[in-house]
Curated annotation (Swiss-Prot):
Primary location group: plastid
GO biological process, one term: photosynthesis
Sites where the protein binds (2R,3E)-phycocyanobilin: 81
Modified residue annotations for N4-methylasparagine: 71
Membrane-topology descriptor: Peripheral membrane protein
SUPFAM superfamilies: Globin-like
Family that this chain belongs to: Belongs to the phycobiliprotein family.
Bilayer-spanning residue ranges: none
Domain of life: Eukaryota
Protein name per Swiss-Prot or TrEMBL: Allophycocyanin beta chain
Amino acid sequence: MQDAITSVINAADVQGKYLDDSSVEKLRGYFQTGELRVRAAATIAANAATIIKESVAKSLLYSDITRPGGNMYTTRRYAACIRDLDYYLRYATYGMLAGDPSILEERVLNGLKETYNSLGVPIGATIQAILAMKEVTISLVGPDAGKEMGLYFDYICSGLG
């Protein structure tokens, strides 16, 4: 896992150079949004169960996926879906705090699509639930933090798509 600071410094170090204006500007932006990201993370942590519940209600609960024969029909499958959504929310929050999506690649997306395909998990429905989670989260954290947080939900969706 990297963060915005490490990414900028490593890029300069690999080239054996000092930070250029663009690198300094990236760091400045990261630090200027620090309080916003921390407040958003606290709001998400305090409302995680509600975010998941509303996301499921918006995207999955009344679809064919939860009816008999659907991929979320049994209690065990439903619980696994809720667990996965919580996992995506938590790691998207970590990525937002770090200002870098590498944790999503390392801990969420690496092999996930293949695993879901082998288990018959419908990726389209998963993406729909993540997009609903993005919408619910943005409504809680506000437009500025929501824009930042949305990047990480979109990253997960892109990795699954």
